Amino acid sequence: MAALLAVAALGWAAPAAARGPRIPATATAQATVVAPLTVVWVQNLVFGKIVPRPQPGTVVVSELTGSCTVTGPIIQVGKCQYAQFAGMGSKNMAARISLTSVANLTGPGAPMVLDQIKLGTNSTITFAGNGNANGNGVGLTKGANAERYTIITASGIYVLNIGGRLNVNANQAGGTYSGSITISVQYQ
């Protein structure tokens, strides 16, 4: 009987011994806190992956939807997205917003020109200036300077989306290209 109990005890001990070591895993949590009278970066302007051809072409990211359209023989695949910034003022506060009109994306080959940079608005901020901006009063066009907007949310937090046109050169060298877009907000 004692031998039977010893075997039974070993049977219960075996599963505990079969457990492997505890392996930790971690995740990153991130939050952006928007302070009053500021503007902060949220996401980059992305044109996806581009296959160049012997002729030039363009990839346009919409400031309203973040979707891409292509002209010319080049091929674009992958995710496109508009750049996004967030800011905080107060409800009905005016803000003059200006941004880069042209930028160069540099990398291993000839620079690519980013132009027709446009600011798209949404339900958090409304255009309150020149009705001819971007043809319909919802954005800035190349050469526009410090257009006036009104913050319309009760919290004063607003979001700005930025799109533009990337001019891809004929036979553009492969690699990663980057450049900068600067946005300036003057609260009034």
Predicted features, each with a name:
Residues S90-V138:
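Contiguous segments within soluble domain cores/interaction surfaces
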Residues G120-L166:
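Acidic, glycine-rich flexible loop segments
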Residues A17-P108, A146-Q188:
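N-terminal small/polar-rich segments of proteins
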Residues M1-A3:
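Bacterial N-terminal signal peptides that target proteins for export
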